[in-house]
Amino acid sequence: EVPSRGLGDVYKRQRLGLTPDTASTQVISRDRHADYVQTLALIGASLDRFSTEIRNLQRTDVLEVEESFAKGQKGSSAMPHKRNPIRSERISGLARVLRSYVVAALENVALWHERDISHSSTERMMLPDCSVTLHFMLREMTAVVAGLGVYPGNMLRNMNVYGGVVFSQRVLLGLVDAGMSREDAYRVVQRNAHSAWNNDGGDFRRNLEADPEVTAKLSPCLLYTSPSPR
């Protein structure tokens, strides 16, 4: 139940968990408003980080995860095969809007003799807009996560591209454990990895198995390039 008008401020403070400012002039210091806006922008940046990763993982050549795609939905008017991560793209775009408000919030901190109201026009737009924007972004990310498609088979395929070249560190550490100096191990592994990378259809695992410097220390190399823990 909303209290009578005379107790309205008390009610709002209690609902929002706010306390009165113990030292203020005509206006409350705007550093706390700036802190609020920066916090919203930071949350938005985290959502942007998640959505950017989803967008990259949804690329056609990667396709390890994917936003839900409704029947009849269009990803591109020109390319019918596309299934664009529209929600994640929207989140990344709105995160930029949130970050743009941080500058305005910080510029509002310095007021003439701690009491002019130049901040007011900015805050009338900034505070409601950044609050509603973040709320919308959170709703969008919730929908993304709820409908996210995950493709373990494609993850395994990508890890095994070029014969498991992504496991080069495991080979490096295996050679070092077997007695090879780290500098020599790095040189040997890099040579075999780059050979697989630079040659179409190259195979890191086969390169290692054919390298006498490797086989003199490790056998079989498959133990160090397998995706499963050893």
Which residues does each PLM region occupy?
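Glycine-rich anion/phosphate-binding loop at the beta-strand->alpha-helix junction
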Residues: 29-115
